Amino acid sequence: MTAEEAPRKFPRVLLEIFIAVALLGLGWYGLSIAQRQRPYLGDPLPRGSEALIPYRVLAAPNIPALGLFLGSVFAGVTGAAWLILRGIHQLFFRPVRASRVWREAILIAVFVLSLAWLQLNQAFSVLLAATIAVALILLEVFLNIRVRDE
């Protein structure tokens, strides 16, 4: 077999794109199921009173529906963030390192998930969100410094 006849290797980026789109779809599907299940136990709310959902969740939580909601948010945000970050890294940070893109996508998903959890428990504040964001950004900066030194 000569060099011209060698089989072409399957591009790894296509596999990563497939995984990111699958995570995005899984998150979207899980969120649609979690929305149909009530995140609280008890009678359904009348239409137009969605503002009462946090109070009902705190009064009688439906743990499987909340777990599905939080897991779906994590999967969907990870997939969406990966697609956006991959494009940004392709434009500005060549060569693109897959581990860095996945790590940043997961950190963004952790940030969004923590904000969703805080909002669900009515403990969300802009100052707390900024503190969490600064902590995660510093973590990413320190990880980039460590990887660069190795």
Write out the residue ranges for each language-model feature.
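Alpha-helical transmembrane segments and their helix-start/interface "positive-inside/aromatic belt" motifs
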Residues: T2-A22
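Membrane-helix boundary elements
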Residues: L23-G76
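Short juxtamembrane and helix-loop transition motifs at transmembrane-helix boundaries
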Residues: P61-L68, L85-A98
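Non-transmembrane, aqueous-exposed alpha-helical and coiled segments at domain scale
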Residues: G71, T78, V96-R97, R103, ...
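Hydrophobic, membrane-inserted alpha-helices
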Residues: I108-W117, A133-L136
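Membrane-helix boundary connector in multi-pass membrane proteins
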Residues: S114-A130
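Juxtamembrane membrane-interface segments at transmembrane alpha-helix termini
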Residues: L139-E150
